[in-house]
C-alpha cells in the first residue's frame, strides 16, 4: 500500500486524497488505489497540485478517452482541455445551476477533472449532490415508479442559438449550431462499476420524461430536484489554486456558485468519456 491519506469531507460524499503528486507518473498500484477510491466515493479532491496542461492530460488519460468539448473555449494549444472562466466584468458564470456534465450525449461522460488555476479571494465554491443517496432516500413507491421510466436530455435550450445563457456567455461558449442532439436515458441507472443504483436526471439538461409532455414532466422533475438538493445530500468544496475536483458524472450533480462579483475564477477541465447507461 502507498502512504497516501484519504480523508472524508464534511458533506454527504467525497474524500480528499493527500500525499500524492499528480505531476509525477503514478505507479500502477497507486493509480489502482486512487481508482478504487474514486469508484467507491464518486468524488475525490486533491490539493496543492502544480500541474502543467500536459500533466493534467497525462493523469486524465489514465482513466480513458478524452472528450473534446464542442461548446467551451479551449486552453490555447490544448483542444482536450476546456477553459471554464469568469472575468471581473462578467455577470454570468459557467455551470451556475445543478447539472451533470454531458447527459445530453448518447453516451454520457464518465467523469470531469477540474483544476483550479485562479480563484477569487472569497466565494466561488462548488456544491455537489449524491445521486446514490438521492435514489436510496426515495420512497419504495417512487422507486418502483421511476424504475421503468426514461427521460430526454438536451443541450438545445442551454448551448443552442438565441438562448439567454449562450448569448450572455458568447465569449466563452461557442458552436451553437452543434447543440442539436438529444438523448434518452433511464431515470434510474445501475452504475457500471460500483453496481449501485443512482437517480439519473438533472434540472439543467433533462427536459421531460419519455412519453410525457413538458408540462406533465415539470412537477416530478421539480420534486426530484428538491429531494436531491437537500442539505444532508450535498457537499461543498472550497477552491484554492492547485485544487482538483474529480467527479463521477454517473452519480453526482454539481453547481458552481456565482458569489464573487468583480473577481476572476479560472479553471481547466478535462472530461473523460464514458459508456452507455442502463
Where are these regions (language model features)?
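Fe(II)/2-oxoglutarate oxygenase catalytic core
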Residues: 2-246, 250-278
Amino acid at each position: 500500500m502507498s502512504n497516501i491519506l484519504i480523508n472524508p469531507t464534511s458533506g454527504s460524499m467525497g474524500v480528499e486524497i493527500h500525499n500524492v503528486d499528480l505531476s509525477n507518473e503514478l505507479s500502477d498500484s497507486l493509480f489502482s488505489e486512487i481508482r478504487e477510491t474514486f469508484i467507491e466515493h464518486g468524488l475525490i479532491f486533491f490539493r496543492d497540485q502544480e500541474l502543467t496542461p500536459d500533466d493534467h492530460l497525462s493523469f486524465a488519460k489514465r482513466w480513458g478517452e478524452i472528450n473534446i468539448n464542442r461548446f467551451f473555449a479551449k486552453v490555447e494549444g490544448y483542444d482536450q482541455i476546456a477553459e471554464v472562466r469568469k472575468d471581473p466584468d462578467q455577470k454570468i458564470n459557467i455551470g451556475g445551476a445543478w447539472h451533470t456534465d454531458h447527459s445530453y450525449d448518447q453516451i454520457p461522460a464518465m467523469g470531469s477533472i477540474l483544476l483550479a488555476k485562479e480563484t477569487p479571494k472569497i466565494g466561488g465554491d462548488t456544491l455537489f449532490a449524491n445521486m446514490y443517496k438521492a435514489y436510496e432516500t426515495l420512497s419504495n413507491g417512487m422507486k418502483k415508479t421511476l424504475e421503468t421510466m426514461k427521460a430526454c436530455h438536451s443541450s438545445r435550450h442551454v448551448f443552442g442559438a438565441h438562448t439567454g445563457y449562450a448569448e450572455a456567455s458568447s465569449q466563452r461558449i461557442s458552436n451553437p449550431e452543434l447543440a442539436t442532439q438529444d438523448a434518452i436515458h433511464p431515470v434510474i441507472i445501475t452504475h457500471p462499476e460500483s453496481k449501485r443504483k443512482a437517480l439519473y436526471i438533472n434540472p439543467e439538461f433533462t427536459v421531460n420524461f419519455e412519453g410525457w409532455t413538458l408540462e406533465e414532466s415539470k412537477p416530478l422533475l421539480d420534486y426530484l430536484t428538491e429531494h436531491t438538493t437537500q442539505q444532508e445530500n450535498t457537499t461543498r468544496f472550497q477552491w484554492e489554486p492547485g485544487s482538483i475536483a474529480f467527479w463521477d458524472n454517473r452519480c453526482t450533480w454539481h453547481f458552481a456558485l456565482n458569489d464573487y462579483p468583480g473577481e476572476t475564477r479560472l479553471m481547466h477541465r478535462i472530461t473523460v468519456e464514458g459508456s452507455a447507461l442502463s
